[in-house]
From Swiss-Prot:
It is found in: Plastid, Chloroplast thylakoid membrane. It comes from the Eukaryota. Keywords: Chloroplast, Membrane, Photosynthesis, Photosystem I, Plastid, Thylakoid. Disulfide bonds: none annotated. Belongs to the PsaD family. This is Photosystem I reaction center subunit II. It is a peripheral membrane protein. One of its GO terms (biological process) is photosynthesis. GO terms for cellular component: chloroplast thylakoid membrane; photosystem I. PsaD can form complexes with ferredoxin and ferredoxin-oxidoreductase in photosystem I (PS I) reaction center. PSAD may encode the ferredoxin-docking protein.
Length: 36
């Protein structure tokens, strides 16, 4: 259903972390790898 697609998109966005978003759970090195 649509909800499943939304959840999947959210999971991907959270995993990849969009530019400008700095999750406190991820270390600076991890964020650099994602942003870089």
């Amino acid at each position: 259903x649509t909800e499943d697609k939304t959840d999947a998109a959210t999971d991907v966005a959270t995993x990849e972390a969009p530019v400008g978003f700095t999750p406190x759970e991820l270390d600076p090195n991890t964020x650099s790898x994602i942003f870089g």
